[in-house]
């Protein structure tokens, strides 16, 4: 579907110069002289390159719709991750860098959403929140209980998050995968 250059929004997937790009940021600019334009920061979903492009209002670009499919994470094998299609039980192996930093939050049996373009995996979406166990938490400094201060803690997957002072080692908590932040105690 073709869209105008000024209708581009963050999160859009675009076909531009024979590549598939995900829009990271946009900034609409109306200079004093000349026409308005949209400054767009994009990342190539195939090779990971980043670029900044200026689209005028008269420019059109192809917006791509990605197919999405549920997959279940099975196991990690070196730098590769093995997933299974929950409908057909077919297995697929993907490089861990496709997930970026979020790969640390993968858990056995976790259902993820694979975004595909022409039957080719482009990105993996994890659930927004996951449960994890704290393996190491700093001691509470006396007198800090009145303020809303947080202390650093390390999770069982090696990720460091800030938690409230009352959270101790061994506690199961809920973590926001993309913000890497404490959400609450797990049930």
UniProtKB/Swiss-Prot annotation:
Record key words, sorted: Cytoplasm, Elongation factor, Protein biosynthesis
InterPro entries hit by this protein: Elong-fact-P_C (IPR015365), NA-bd_OB-fold (IPR012340), Rib_uL2_dom2 (IPR014722), Transl_elong_fac_P/YeiP (IPR020599), Transl_elong_KOW-like (IPR013185), Transl_elong_P/YeiP_cen (IPR001059), Transl_elong_P/YeiP_CS (IPR013852), Transl_elongation_fac_P (IPR011768)
Pfam families hit by this protein: EFP, EFP_N, Elong-fact-P_C
CC annotations in GO: cytoplasm
GO MF terms, alphabetically ordered: translation elongation factor activity
Pathway: Protein biosynthesis; polypeptide chain elongation
Subcellular location as annotated: Cytoplasm
Domain of life of the source: Bacteria
UniProt-listed PROSITE patterns: EFP
GO BP annotations, alphabetical order: peptide biosynthetic process
Family according to the record: Belongs to the elongation factor P family.
NCBIfam families from the UniProt entry: efp (TIGR00038), PRK00529.1 (NF001810)
Function: Involved in peptide bond synthesis. Stimulates efficient translation and peptide-bond synthesis on native or reconstituted 70S ribosomes in vitro. Probably functions indirectly by altering the affinity of the ribosome for aminoacyl-tRNA, thus increasing their reactivity as acceptors for peptidyl transferase.
Protein name from the UniProt record: Elongation factor P
Name of the gene: efp
């Amino acid at each position: 579907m073709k869209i105008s250059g000024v209708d581009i929004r963050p999160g859009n997937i675009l076909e531009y110069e024979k590549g598939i790009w995900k829009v990271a940021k946009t900034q609409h600019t109306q200079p004093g002289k000349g026409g308005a334009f949209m400054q767009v920061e994009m990342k190539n979903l195939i090779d990971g390159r980043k670029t900044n492009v200026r689209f005028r209002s008269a420019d059109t670009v192809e917006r791509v719709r990605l197919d999405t499919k549920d997959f279940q994470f099975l196991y990690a094998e070196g730098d590769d991750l093995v997933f299974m299609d929950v409908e057909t039980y077919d297995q697929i192996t993907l490089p861990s860098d496709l997930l970026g930093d979020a790969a640390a939050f993968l858990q056995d049996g976790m259902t993820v959403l694979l975004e595909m373009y022409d039957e080719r995996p482009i990105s993996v979406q994890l659930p927004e929140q996951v449960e994890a166990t704290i393996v190491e938490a700093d001691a509470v400094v006396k007198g800090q209980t009145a303020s809303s201060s947080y202390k650093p803690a390390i999770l069982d997957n090696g990720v460091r998050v800030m938690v409230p002072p009352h959270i101790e080692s061994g506690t199961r908590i809920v973590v926001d995968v993309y913000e890497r932040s404490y959400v609450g105690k797990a049930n």
